[in-house]
């Protein structure tokens, strides 16, 4: 990358997917979406696992979007995407500008060279905060941050780990009776 942009501010804290997409769409508009641009998003976040932000950004920018992109080919302003499905894939074509939510198989990361690592320290990183974005109609104190989030998490926890399974070996009647007795004892059957 030649430059970076950090979107950050206290006003953005506590945002759910709706509010996050408002903020990111405003930031993308601030940077500028050109006719031949492609906005790349991940498939989903690991914290909420909702897979909503990318699609919501595309809606707010009024650009086409394709989800679950596994392979992308660009020819001028035509974008051809192999989209993964549960039981196969489909190939879709769209025009730029567009937004793609990508699965990890789309890219094989490469290791940075030492020179590349050193170069990254000289690349500019600008910050877009609330004051930089507040003139955008998407940035309204009632639609961003905790106040603007229609969903709230009241409790988050890691469920207790279940114990190791019990292994039964054998293919005789006694093994089957032992299995049936265990299942009855646990009220499974």
Where are these regions (language model features)?
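N-terminal glycine-rich FAD/FM-binding segment characteristic of electron-transfer flavoproteins
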Residues: 1-189
């Amino acid at each position: 990358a030649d430059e970076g942009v950090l979107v950050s501010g206290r006003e953005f804290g506590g945002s759910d997917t709706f509010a996050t997409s408002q903020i990111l769409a405003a930031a993308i508009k601030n940077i500028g979406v050109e006719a031949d641009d492609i906005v790349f998003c991940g498939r989903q976040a690991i914290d909420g696992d909702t897979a909503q932000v990318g699609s919501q950004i595309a809606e707010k920018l009024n650009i086409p979007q394709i989800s679950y992109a596994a392979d992308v080919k660009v020819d001028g302003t035509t974008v051809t995407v192999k989209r993964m499905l549960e039981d196969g894939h489909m190939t879709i074509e769209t025009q730029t500008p567009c937004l793609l939510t990508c699965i990890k198989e789309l890219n094989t990361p490469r290791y940075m060279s030492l020179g590349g690592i050193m170069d990254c320290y000289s690349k500019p990183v600008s910050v877009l905060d609330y004051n930089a974005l507040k003139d955008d109609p998407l940035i309204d104190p009632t639609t961003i941050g905790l106040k603007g989030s229609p969903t709230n998490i009241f409790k988050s926890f890691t469920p207790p780990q279940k114990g190791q399974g019990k292994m039964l070996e054998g293919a005789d009647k006694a093994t089957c009776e032992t299995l049936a007795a265990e299942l009855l004892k646990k009220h499974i059957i």
